[in-house]
Amino acid sequence: MKKLLLFVLIVVVLAGAAAALQYSRVREPYRGYEAAEQFVEIPQGAGSRGIGERLAEAGIVRDARTFRVALWLSGQGRKLKAGEYRFDRPMTPLEVIDKLARGDVYVVTVTFPEGLTMFEMARIFEAHGFGPADTFVAAARDATPIKDLDPAAKDLEGYLFPETYALPRRTDASKLVRLMTSRFEHVLTPDLREAAAARHLSMHEVVTLASIVEKETARADERPLVAGVYTNRLRIGMALACDPTVIYALQRMGRYNGNLHKADLSMDSPYNTYRYPGLPPGPIASPGRAALEAAVQPADTDYLYFVSRNDGSHAFARTYDEHKRNVEKYQVEYFRDLRAGRSGAAGGEGGAERELKPGAMAQARRSAARRP
């Protein structure tokens, strides 16, 4: 009898010691990996045993048993969320469980500014480590995601909505372009679609015009005015004479070096709006919400011309003679003064300290030459 009692006592003591050890480990920070950071993927539908084994293998917790004890103590067994998690410091099992219960998954924040082409977006995709740029371009060449919205689309240029995205580390190009086109469709509110229909504009025309507006001005107050200029030109059959469309053609041909030359304006491309009337074949960049709204709600104006003031704004004109005066003031005189080293050139920022870009005078002459 004494031996039985002794045996029971030993078992109780050992069990208590084991429980105490497990209890202490639950509250003991642990780090079993040598790298600066460790990533663990928790699959959808994974059970507590599988999660514990993954965490133990990655060195996040000491062992799967300790994790399960901690999970039982926490009462959060049904709250753990799937996803990829990043760990970079010692953590107790309870802290690990709290992280998984909150769904504090690791994401990469990526910003795609307004006005980028799909090729420029592809470089951002690659720069953030998601994969080669050409995989993004390949995915963007497939117009399937927006065929219901725009049957005329040849690719996703213009439909990859520009904004900041929080993405899982292993996001592939196909998944991202689907997300971006889905976001684009969400931005197309019923009011915006109704405004387009009221103006008898197809979605292809809306996005194409909006992309031009996006490239021409970054000022919110000017977008409706720029849209109004191009709407007026389209109405009377006047060439759009839009530099960004020519630049886009050169970019697609791999011939753009940062400068636009007079000879480029006669190049044979359907995107050359100096040579071919009407809108180009499709969007030349990804417009933001404001540019889309401007395209369907342009300013009610009789402006036909505009020219840069070299401070981010533009001077608008109704007649060609008025436009020529603006060009002389804000372009010809401005760059002439810069070359002469005079400070405070009209419309400039910093006078002679502002760098004179190659081809600026040629651009001024082009602006003066734009007419019906």
Language model region names:
Residues M1-L14:
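N-terminal Sec-pathway targeting helices
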